[in-house]
Each structure stands twice: as C-alpha cells, then as structure tokens.
C-alpha cells in the first residue's frame, strides 16, 4: 500500500467515524426523549389522578389507573437512569468533535502541503487517542454510515440508530 492509499483510507475512516458519532448522538438523544417525555406526562397524570382519587375514592378504575401510571413511571424512570441515554449522546458528540478535529487537520494538510511520515504519525496518534476515549457505536450504525458513503443516494435503513 502506498502512503497516498493509506492517507485515502484514513480520510474515509475519519469521515465515517465522525459521521457515525454524530448519528449515535442523535440516536441516543431520541431514546432519551422517548423515555423522558412519557415519564413527564405520566408524572403529571399521576398527580392529577391522586387529587381525583381523593374525591372519588370508591371508583375502581381511578385506583387502577393510579397503579398503572405509578408502575409505568417507575419503570421508565428506572430504564432512563440505567441506560443513561443523555450521557451517551453527550459522549458521542464529544467523540465526533475530537475525530472531526483530526479529520480537518488531515484535510487541511492535504490541501496546503505534502504529508510526510512525521505528520502521518502525529495524525495517527491523535486519532488513536480520540478512539480510546470514544464510546462504542450502537449495533450496525458504522456499517450503515459506510454504506451511505458508498451509495449516497440510498436511504438509511430504519432500525437501530
């Protein structure tokens, strides 16, 4: 493999990783909302239902609704706390920024000067450092980003991220 081919592979890899981390951040932000919004709505409904049940203590469906809302709210809150979707989203955003900086540095060098061995080593070390701190992608996400890079007109598949 020639140095030019290696740098070309690095450009593709950095581009894929950069985009995949942003896509992962969006994915985890959506999950955070999917769990968070229903929890807030259920909390409001539960609060309203408590006041209603005080007035209609003998109505069975009100008591059943309170139990269902309480259990659902506890389950969603627990899942949201356990999976830490907002934290995961933030970690992917940070990784995307770090990898983007490495990518932009490489692209700038390719435009304005030759890439020598010392520069290539420095880029590889920066990329390795960013990868060590980066979280893993959701299953199949990187492959979808790679497919989109090869076929830009293809729509992304709906599953996962």
Give, region by region, the residue ranges found by the protein language model.
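Alpha-helical transmembrane segments of integral membrane proteins
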Residues: 39, 43-46, 70-73
């Amino acid at each position: 493999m020639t140095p030019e081919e290696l740098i070309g592979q690095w450009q593709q890899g950095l581009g894929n990783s950069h985009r995949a981390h942003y896509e992962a951040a969006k994915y985890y932000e959506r999950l955070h909302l999917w769990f968070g919004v229903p929890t807030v709505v259920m909390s409001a409904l539960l609060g309203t239902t408590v006041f209603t049940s005080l007035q209609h203590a003998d109505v069975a469906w009100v008591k059943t609704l309170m139990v269902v809302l309480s259990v659902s709210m506890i389950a969603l809150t627990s899942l949201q706390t356990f999976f830490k979707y907002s934290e995961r989203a933030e970690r992917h955003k940070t990784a995307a920024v770090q990898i983007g900086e490495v990518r932009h540095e490489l692209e700038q060098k390719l435009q304005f000067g030759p890439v020598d061995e010392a520069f290539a080593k420095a880029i590889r070390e920066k990329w390795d450092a960013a990868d060590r701190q980066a979280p893993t992608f959701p299953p199949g996400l990187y492959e979808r980003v790679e497919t989109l890079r090869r076929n830009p007109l293809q729509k992304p598949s709906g599953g996962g991220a």
